[in-house]
């Protein structure tokens, strides 16, 4: 009887231990309330410990140092284009791979301290992307307001909350209004109602899922070789999704191209064998 009870207790303890180990630790661009945090929740559900960092580079550095299992960072926006920080960190950290992607519909709102009126606003805080996405609305409705760039849309909301002054506002999410005790002074101020942002889920494990629908890699080389690379991709039925470039900072016309396309790890291997570029595999993954 004792041995049976001991066995049951052992199984329960192992189950608890396994459950605790299975829960991922995930870094993201913070503070609390950012769209990056929302992307974490979409990808991992509520099963995870989410750690906010003040910049994309610090979120990724925590992954590199082994302080977390994954990092979730913004990649590209419909209106603002590439989030260049993400390109730079992937170029810099060769040990980092793309394990997944999340696509979110982004609704930007003008948040202010409770009781504030639009005529009160003298300064607006937001991330560079939030400012770009809401620029037309700002120019039309509060053209004289000072616009100040901060590290994230949530950081802007946090600053307004701390100042407790009706002359300040932030371009941020509806979730941040709740988190930081603010009111939505104007909803949906983005330039495009179909405004979306892609987020990458990064890890230190090299993914090579043959069933995945997307593929990402970095091509390093001269700009005049790019047409040949695109032609080779087309021949292998790899449809280009997005391409972002950064200079190598060696000679004019030499770039890093971060490319996302349809295809699998096998597609990448075939492409890498016949390319004039130095190719670096980032991952095969699906989009959520």
Residue ranges and their predicted role:
Residues 1-8:
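Bacterial N-terminal signal peptides that target proteins for export
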């Amino acid at each position: 009887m004792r041995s049976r009870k001991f066995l049951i207790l052992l199984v329960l303890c192992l189950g608890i231990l396994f459950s605790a180990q299975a829960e991922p630790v995930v870094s993201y661009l913070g503070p609390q309330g950012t769209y990056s945090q929302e992307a974490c929740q979409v990808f991992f559900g509520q099963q995870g410990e989410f750690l906010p960092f003040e910049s994309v580079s610090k979120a990724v550095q925590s992954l590199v140092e082994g302080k977390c299992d994954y990092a979730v960072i913004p990649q590209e926006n419909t209106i603002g284009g590439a989030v260049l920080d993400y390109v730079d960190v992937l170029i810099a950290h060769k040990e980092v791979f793309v394990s997944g992607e999340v696509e979110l519909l982004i609704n930007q709102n003008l948040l202010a301290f409770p009781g504030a009126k639009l005529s009160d606003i003298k300064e607006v805080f937001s991330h560079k992307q939030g400012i770009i996405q809401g620029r037309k609305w700002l120019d039309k409705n509060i053209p004289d307001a000072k616009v100040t760039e901060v590290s994230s849309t949530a950081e802007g909301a946090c600053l307004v909350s701390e100042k407790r002054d009706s002359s300040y506002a932030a371009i941020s999410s509806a979730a941040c209004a709740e988190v930081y005790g603010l009111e939505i002074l104007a909803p949906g101020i983005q330039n495009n109602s179909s405004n979306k942002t892609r987020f990458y889920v990064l890890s230190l494990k090299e993914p090579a899922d043959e069933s995945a629908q997307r593929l990402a890699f970095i091509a390093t080389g001269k700009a005049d070789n790019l047409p040949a690379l695109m032609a080779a991709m087309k021949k292998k039925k790899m449809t280009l999704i997005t391409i972002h470039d950064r200079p190598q900072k060696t000679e004019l016309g030499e770039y890093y191209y971060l490319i996302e396309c349809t295809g699998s790890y096998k597609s990448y291997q075939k492409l890498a064998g016949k390319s004039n570029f130095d190719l670096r595999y980032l991952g095969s993954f699906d989009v959520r």
